[in-house]
């Protein structure tokens, strides 16, 4: 594949094998910089390097996770090659039964797989991989349980029952919220020992589904079993031999369950053991022990039989095992299940060449036959077949050939039903020959034609090998607030504080009984949440987790706690300015400009609030204040020192303070405040401050009428006016106003408090001098 940068919002599917063909299944998924490989098989119709997927077309070092759906050779046989002979460095996962069978199956495969395949029939001495490669790769394989989710650097995947063979799994892969379901080979039919394929609980955005049988429909299971047993019974009754080419594991066990039961039920008709059944495979006994071990992972029927009879259902009464043909005495009728299922080589091919000239014999194909294999060729009923030892030698074929598919693959009806239940808007077809796959694509598009042109339109793709499918996904990015910043974001939900301000005319009305909320019986997280204030700015740090694709909004103080891999550095600014004025004048200018002034130390050195350790033992004449909550100003001996945490807002405020300090001694406002002028009011003997307070009180009388009271007595009129207050009472809402400080000191209603502060601001502007 040509190396090109994939857009971060684009998902790419790239088939290295198994696209528009059956065999060498291998698919690449790429999204958000993550790469997943699905399966690593070989093509049963080819040998050596030619049987491998097109690994040279992709840089396997990019693959982080490789998922093996099941143990069949066309899905798993090139895994040791990938792990030991390429630059692959990722992690490999499969289910427990798959790993248990994998080693035995591939040990046998090593013996018959060679690099190269010349037209003359010669075979090279070098294999695709060695037993040492297989052993080393085996130790690196990790197992996964059904329904458990594993997270590898942000790639999450969950295994589900696929129903194809023991241990077969469908994988739902999730990357940055995008879910891809890969079915592998799957079956929705409940057979004698396996569960049918499951429907994942979470929806999928992309479905990668097999299309082995295209639009074909299977016979009912009971009909197939009856036809199978009748054909075999008829053949052996005539003295013939029956060859059933099967894969060593999978459908072979299903057919053995059928035949063992039939032989027990028809023992007399079959000569009470005179017609033997053999299972010929080098791996027979080894792999059958795996089936006997994992009975509890099979369906309820087989588990019940195991519990009730206390005997393992895979210990057969009427079936014997053959390791090789040297142990087989070929006298009279018999039934032979032999591997491999494609008749390319091995025991099944040897028996085919031995039995095919006899017209009494029967070859019964029970699985799917791949193009280019002897099994597929035999279904054409040729007059002769080539010998495996010498292709120039032709062997006459007179035996009967029948096909009864027990392949654990979905037919069109089952596939369509599954696709509809998954409901994925994007479907990618794999594991199917071009013609059946093309017919399936047309049938699916026709089925979903009513959705074309809508937001729910279903798109179906059937790419060839090494042809990429790019899909655009623009997901919504949601940041999760974590830590202390949550408190800032939550609206005030206290009912009293949220109660709107009532008009004075309604103050005497009786309070209505409070109704219980309709969702009082619900959990807090299920209740309807109060609306959050709009246009409210929340400051924090947005942290993106590249591994898990999570976005977290945290405050600076929480950064280390919630993201231990991040370090923080706080930059403090300090600036010194010489001033030639009194501290009181500086404080007055700061109050006029900013209002929000926290006095830490006054001019006499007395602490007004809790003083930090470094601020104790202050000198007389020192002034220490905090402006806007962040900027600390210390004035000692006509030297002003500012300290603040560096950020955009604090920098701007600090610049404003410096400007005030540099101009405070020459400001007209400073001159006026420092001089002792006559009162500007018309009431001799009354201070200017008291006059201003009374003017502002008039505004309160206009706004609140009798609900407002100015707390002013004769002693206050002649005092220094440092603590003149007023009160506002409206129904159950009340507020205390300190006119000396121009602030609301005590209020139980936010709306009322806001209104009073607004009136105070207007009053301050009205009584302020024009200069």
Curated annotation (Swiss-Prot):
UniProt feature, compositional bias: Basic and acidic residues: 511-530
GO biological process: mRNA processing; sno(s)RNA 3'-end processing; snoRNA splicing; termination of RNA polymerase II transcription
Gene that this polypeptide is encoded by: YSH1
Molecular-function GO terms, alphabetical: 5'-3' RNA exonuclease activity; metal ion binding; RNA binding; RNA endonuclease activity
Record family assignment: Belongs to the metallo-beta-lactamase superfamily. RNA-metabolizing metallo-beta-lactamase-like family. CPSF2/YSH1 subfamily.
Protein name per UniProt: Endoribonuclease YSH1
A Pfam family reported for this protein in Swiss-Prot or TrEMBL: Lactamase_B_6
UniProt lineage: Eukaryota, Fungi, Dikarya, Ascomycota, Saccharomycotina
Organism: Eremothecium gossypii (strain ATCC 10895 / CBS 109.51 / FGSC 9923 / NRRL Y-1056)
Chain intervals for the UniProt region annotation (Disordered): 493-533
EC number: 3.1.27.-
Active site: 409
């Amino acid at each position: 594949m040509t190396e090109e940068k994939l857009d971060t919002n684009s998902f790419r599917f790239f088939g290295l094998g198994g696209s528009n063909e059956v065999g060498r299944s291998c698919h690449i998924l790429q999204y958000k910089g993550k790469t997943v490989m699905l399966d690593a098989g070989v093509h049963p119709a080819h040998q050596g390097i030619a049987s491998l997927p097109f690994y040279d077309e992709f840089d396997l070092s990019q693959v982080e996770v490789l998922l093996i759906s099941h143990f069949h050779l066309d899905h798993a046989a090139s895994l040791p090659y990938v792990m030991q002979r390429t630059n692959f460095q990722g992690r490999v996962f499969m289910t427990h039964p798959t790993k248990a069978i994998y080693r035995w199956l591939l040990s046998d495969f090593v013996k018959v797989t060679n690099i190269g395949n010349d037209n003359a029939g010669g075979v090279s001495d070098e294999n695709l991989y060695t037993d040492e490669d297989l052993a080393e790769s085996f130790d690196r394989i990790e197992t996964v349980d059904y329904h458990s989710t594993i997270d590898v650097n942000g790639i999450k995947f969950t295994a589900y029952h696929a129903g194809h063979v023991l241990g077969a799994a469908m994988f739902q892969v999730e990357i940055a919220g995008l879910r891809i379901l890969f079915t592998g080979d799957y079956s929705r039919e409940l057979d004698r020992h396996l569960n049918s394929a499951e429907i994942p609980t979470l929806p999928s955005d992309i479905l990668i589904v097999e299309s082995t049988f295209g639009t074909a429909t299977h016979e009912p299971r009971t009909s197939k079993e009856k036809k199978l047993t009748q054909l075999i019974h008829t053949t052996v009754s005539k003295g013939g031999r029956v060859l059933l080419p099967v894969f060593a594991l999978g459908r072979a066990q299903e057919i053995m369950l059928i035949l063992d039961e039939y032989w027990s039920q028809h023992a007399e008709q079959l000569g009470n053991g005179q017609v033997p059944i053999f299972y010929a495979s080098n791996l027979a006994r080894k792999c059958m022990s795996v089936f006997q071990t994992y009975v509890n992972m099979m369906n309820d029927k087989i588990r019940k039989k195991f519990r009730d009879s206390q005997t393992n259902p895979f210990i057969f009464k009427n079936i014997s095992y053959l390791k090789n043909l040297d142990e087989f005495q070929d006298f009279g009728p018999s039934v032979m299940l032999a591997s491999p299922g494609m008749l390319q080589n091995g025991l099944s091919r040897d028996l085919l060449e031995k039995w095919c000239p006899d017209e009494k014999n029967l070859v019964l194909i029970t699985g799917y036959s791949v193009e280019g294999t002897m099994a597929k060729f035999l279904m054409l009923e040729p007059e002769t077949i080539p010998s495996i030892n010498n292709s120039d030698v032709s062997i006459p074929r007179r035996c009967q050939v029948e096909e009864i598919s027990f392949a654990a693959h979905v037919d069109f009806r089952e596939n369509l039903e599954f696709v509809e239940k998954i409901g994925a808007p994007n479907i990618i077809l794999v594991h199917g020959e071009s013609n059946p796959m093309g017919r399936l694509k047309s049938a699916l598009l026709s089925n979903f034609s009513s959705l074309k042109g809508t937001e729910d339109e279903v798109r179906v793709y059937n790419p060839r090998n090494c042809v990429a499918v790019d899909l655009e996904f623009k997901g919504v990015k949601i940041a999760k607030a974590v830590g202390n910043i949550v408190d800032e974001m939550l609206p005030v939900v206290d009912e009293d504080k949220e109660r709107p301000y009532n008009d004075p005319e309604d103050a005497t009305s009786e309070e209505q009984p409070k109704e219980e909320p309709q969702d009082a019986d619900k959990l807090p997280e299920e209740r309807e949440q109060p609306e959050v204030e709009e246009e409210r700015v929340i400051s924090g740090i947005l942290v993106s987790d590249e591994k898990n694709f999570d976005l977290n909004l945290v405050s600076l103080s929480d950064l280390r706690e919630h993201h231990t891999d991040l370090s923080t550095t706080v930059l403090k600014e300090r600036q010194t300015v010489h001033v030639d004025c009194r501290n009181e004048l500086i404080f007055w200018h700061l109050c006029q400009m900013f209002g929000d002034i926290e006095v830490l130390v006054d001019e006499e050195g007395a602490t007004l609030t809790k003083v930090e350790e470094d601020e104790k033992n202050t000198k007389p004449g020192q002034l220490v204040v905090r402006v806007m909550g962040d900027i600390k100003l210390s004035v000692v001996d006509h030297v002003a020192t500012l300290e603040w945490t560096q950020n955009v807002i604090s920098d701007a405020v600090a610049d404003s303070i410096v400007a005030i300090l540099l101009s405070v001694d020459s400001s007209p406002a400073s001159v006026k405040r420092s001089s002792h002028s006559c009162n500007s009011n018309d009431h001799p003997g009354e201070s200017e401050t008291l006059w201003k307070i009374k003017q502002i009180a008039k505004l309160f009388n206009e706004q609140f009428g009798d609900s407002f009271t100015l707390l002013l007595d004769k002693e206050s009129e002649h005092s220094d006016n440092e603590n003149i207050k007023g009160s506002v009472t409206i129904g159950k809402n009340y507020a205390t106003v300190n006119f000396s400080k121009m602030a609301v000191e005590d209020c139980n209603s936010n709306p009322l408090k806001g209104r009073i502060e607004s009136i105070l601001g207007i009053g301050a502007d009205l009584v302020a001098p024009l200069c």
